[in-house]
């Protein structure tokens, strides 16, 4: 079974030309699903690297629709939007309708099961009712019964974050966390939100993850060494995934 590479990139980072180049080439190199971040007002569950990328693009990116349409034209793999439900409470229907019209496959709100736990099923129904898939985000702090329930209604895969925020090194036992959740989940299981190195990546795959979501590492590589270096990292991670396929 092919292990999934879910590649995250902030919309428009570091500029539109480089963003499109990274997206297209990453798909050629083996990305299975694209996760594109829309900068929120307050990125409370993102780490400093991704927050910095949000800040870099919000100074000039005023329209998310046009670049998303362009991405949809360029790639034929699933596209998931990652952003915060909190920002779209007043116009959620319009937002979801727009995503559906563009051809976006799914949406992932990392705050859904944390800040809107009492209403999450209602929001999941609303998302699906607009023709958009609902990808649910879970983590170690959620009880088993909620993870099981979320896995049954999550589309495409269940996202499991091993750390409370991205890009922050907090000691956790990646393999034991994933072994626990793997025993609960029948859905595809994608692990991210805090995989810090290749060792974490291999532990996740050995423990039964169906795929990994990588974002901070790519943004850091672009910032330090440029697009080509980040694409080399995509190729390297794809190679590790294929060892476990």
UniProtKB/Swiss-Prot annotation:
GO MF: tryptophan synthase activity
PROSITE patterns for this protein: TRP_SYNTHASE_ALPHA (PS00167)
EC nos: 4.2.1.20
Residues annotated as signal peptide: none
Pfam families assigned to the protein according to its UniProt record, in alphabetical order: Trp_syntA
Coiled coil segments of this chain: none
Pathway: Amino-acid biosynthesis; L-tryptophan biosynthesis; L-tryptophan from chorismate: step 5/5
Catalytic EC class: lyase
SUPFAM superfamilies given in the database record: Ribulose-phoshate binding barrel
Active site: 35 (proton acceptor), 46 (proton acceptor)
Catalysed reactions, semicolon-separated: (1S,2R)-1-C-(indol-3-yl)glycerol 3-phosphate + L-serine = D-glyceraldehyde 3-phosphate + L-tryptophan + H2O
Subunit structure: Tetramer of two alpha and two beta chains.
Function: The alpha subunit is responsible for the aldol cleavage of indoleglycerol phosphate to indole and glyceraldehyde 3-phosphate.
Protein family per UniProt: Belongs to the TrpA family.
Protein's name in the database: Tryptophan synthase alpha chain
Taxonomic placement: Archaea, Thermoproteota, Thermoprotei, Sulfolobales, Sulfolobaceae
Gene name linked to the record: trpA
